[in-house]
Amino acid sequence: MESRNFKLDTEWNVIHYPERPNGFGILTIGDERHFVNSSSSFWTQNEGKRSLLNIWKKEGYTVFYSNLYGRHWGSEKAVELTLRLCSHIVRNEILNTSFHLVAEGMGALVALKLLKHSDFKIRSLVLINPVLSLSTQLEQEKENKFFYKKLVAELEAAYETDINTLLESLDGESSRPAFNNDTPVKIIHVLSGNRAYKQSSIIKELSVEWEKDDLPVTISYVLPEKMLQVGSQIVQFFRKHEQVL
C-alpha cells in the first residue's frame, strides 16, 4: 500500500508509506494552498511537493499530514487536530514516536504551538518560508488593503471570533518564536517575490537573538530554481538528529 487516506473529525488525512521504512516519520503542515481530500492532496498534485515527497519516501521516511480545516492560521483547533493525528499514527504505525516536522508558511504557526506541548516530542523542525508571528503578518498585510481584508476574513473563520477579540488576545504576544535548546531547527527561506524578501529581513533580525541565546537554529537562503536541492538538504538535516532514538 503506497498511501492511505482517512478521516479524523471532519478532516481528511494522508499517510504515505515508503518501500523500505527507516522507522522515522515526517509530519508536514502546509501553507495556504495545502489541501487533502478523500483521494488526493496538494502533495501529490503539485510537482515540486511531489518530488520532495518522493525523495523522502526513497530515503525510507513515512510522511503524513492533514487538511487541518484549510486556512487555519495556527488556530487551537488545528493544533488539537495535529496532536490527534500524531496519536493516531503512534497507535497504528510502527514508527519512532519522536517525529520530524516540516512546516511551510502559516503551518509554522501550528509547529511553534506544538513546541510548547511538553508531552509532544519533535525530533527536528524544518520551517520553509515560515510565518513566525500572526501580529507581524497582520502588520505586513496592512500595506495592501485587499490582502489585509482577505486575511482578516480568514482569521475570523479560523479562530471563530471577530478580529478585535483576536487582536486583543495577540496583544503582548512576543513576535519572537519560542524555540528551545532541545529541538534543532532549520529555516529554509526561498527568495521569490517581494513578500519573501520582507520575511527574510525579519528572520535576519531574529537570528541575531537566536545566536545570542545559543539556540540550535540554522538558516539557509535558496533561490527558486534551486528548490529541487531542498529535499536532500532536509534529509541531511534529519539524519544528524537520528542518532539518539
List PLM regions with ranges.
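Structural beta-sheet core signal
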Residues: 28, 101, 187-189
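Primarily recognizes the serine-hydrolase "nucleophile elbow" in alpha/beta-hydrolase
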Residues: 91-92, 97-146
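Short, surface-exposed "cap/lid" segments of acyl-processing enzymes
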Residues: 6-59
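Alpha/beta-hydrolase active-site loop
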Residues: 72-94
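A catalytic-pocket lid/entrance helix-loop region that shapes and gates access to the active site
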Residues: 139-161
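Short beta-to-alpha linker loops that shape the active-site pocket of alpha/beta-hydrolase fold enzymes
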Residues: 32, 62, 67-71, 131
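Serine-hydrolase catalytic core
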Residues: 157-245
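Glycine-rich, often proline-containing surface loops adjacent to acidic residues and nearby aromatics
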Residues: 57-67, 105, 183-186
